[in-house]
Amino acid sequence: MAMSLKKIGAIAVGGAMVATALASGVAAEVTTSGFSDYKELKDILVKDGQPNCYVVVGADAPSTMDVVSAADIAAKIGSLCYKEGTVEDGSADITVHAEANSDDFDLKKDWNNSAMPANAYALFVAASDGDYSEKFENDTGKPSFMDNGVLGDADKINKTVDLGDIATMMKVDDVDPSDWYDSDDDAGEIVMVELKNDTSDGFTVYKKNMLYETLVYKDDEENFANTTKMEEGMRIPFLGKEMVVVDIDKDDDAIYLGTPVYDGIIKEGETYDLGNGYQVKIKAILKTTVNNTDVYKVDVQILKDGKVVAEKYDKAPLELEYKDDVGVTVHKAWENVGGDYGYAELVISKDLKKLELDEEYVTDWKAYAVLNDNGTMKLEDDLNDNNVDKVVGIALRYDGDKLDDLDSGDEVDILDYVKFKLDDEDSNDKLKVYFSMDKDVDATLNIGEKVKALNAEVKLKDIKANAVEPVSLTAPIAKLDTEVSLDTADKNLVLVGGPVANKLTKELVDAGKLALDNNSPATIALIPDAANGHDVIVVAGGDREKTREAALELIKNL
């Protein structure tokens, strides 16, 4: 049975470990050809700190061992990736870069095996996890759970199309890392574009017909009905970065997000130094009794250059912000057994983002809270006691002028984060649409701080002469041999498996560029310019055990 990439979830760039690749201590006899130094291969696999290849495994490979080998090679490539930053006064400015595309839809062929009808509306959806976007799909209209007020012309949508995942969009696998809410829930990003085949103006995107969302889902769930309450202190993705929900302010109809700096416990009277002259102090904790229940009030201060610039005294939980610089979310407080002093459990954030509901967050994009109202998705701009417990996420909706006359070569920008592109691939019979990301995210880190962005985690451990920081990019570089052609490849290729398991390897053997059969030893071969001008590295052998030996040898020497 042919495999799909979704089933091979382990094949991703992830440098945390090299899976089982280093488990074997047995020296293998491996035949090499086409290169004299493994450094040559490393330069082919990674360029400027980024993956420069695809790892290709056979869709009909008879052995899962080839899949494991491909996963281990991909993981090793991930461990070789890095980012550079400039160092100044104990901090580093870093940039994380990512590129990825969603699946595509041909407007001239894929609408019920025909062209998209005149005046029809289609909603295209992609997400950081394809399981989320899949649940939006509907061949006969808008998503079944979506209220008409979520998008303009939602009641006119004729078809909702799932374009799968954009691998470099952000997903958070644990929104509650400190177990404030005893939750292992997830959060992911979703983008939507509603496109009309307007006979007078070509393809058109109207006002209110694009949406970006970040939603909190119950652990391992993907239906919108199973989204769950977004709480203060939770981590959610927002435009490619993992951020803290600092405050959900009913009085101000605003949601504050921030970059987490410290998550833990501070003793009464102590301070935490954020750098740049900022400190957070727990000045006092006072216990009172209300209806035979202990209630703890916390006096929390934000200081700048030693002066108090913001202060709040209230019962926990409580929130405090100062400008766009610092946010404090106190979850709970308590005293020691003797009642001598207290402790506050909190998260401190910097670089705050204030999303004022029904106001522009950036030009042409307004912010809203997303509600799960008994299974129905709604947007809300007026938070109150009756609906705040239904808030499951944040939305930014396009509020600019219509974008018309769209055709091949055009692209629609979504928050300077994702683009929606049209491409006829130089054919009059095609017009494909898809989502695409080519994005940089910048961050400034002090020693010991980390940031998660575009599915990469960067931690600044120390300041060196050159701030080169390894990163673990989780955007997949794996492909099936049914998805890659030697004639059209746009990157170097690592082919895992012999001619029986991998059809691209077979093509090279049939063309006389590689000698490999069922009796061949473990082999690592470099074949320059064999894939549309790109280099090919073959990791294979006469059987699956020999292929495994070759994979382990490659990993050991990179």
UniProtKB/Swiss-Prot annotation:
Residues 1-28 form the signal peptide. It is found in: Secreted, Cell wall, S-layer. The keyword Cell wall biogenesis/degradation applies. Pfam families: S_layer_C, S_layer_N. Glycans are attached at N112, N138, N158, N197, N226, N291, N374. GO terms for cellular component: extracellular region; S-layer. It comes from the Archaea. Keywords: Cell wall, Cell wall biogenesis/degradation, Glycoprotein, S-layer, Secreted, Signal. One of its GO terms (biological process) is cell wall organization. Belongs to the Mj S-layer protein family. NCBIfam families: S_layer_MJ. S-layer protein. The S-layer is a paracrystalline mono-layered assembly of proteins which coat the surface of the cell. This is S-layer protein.
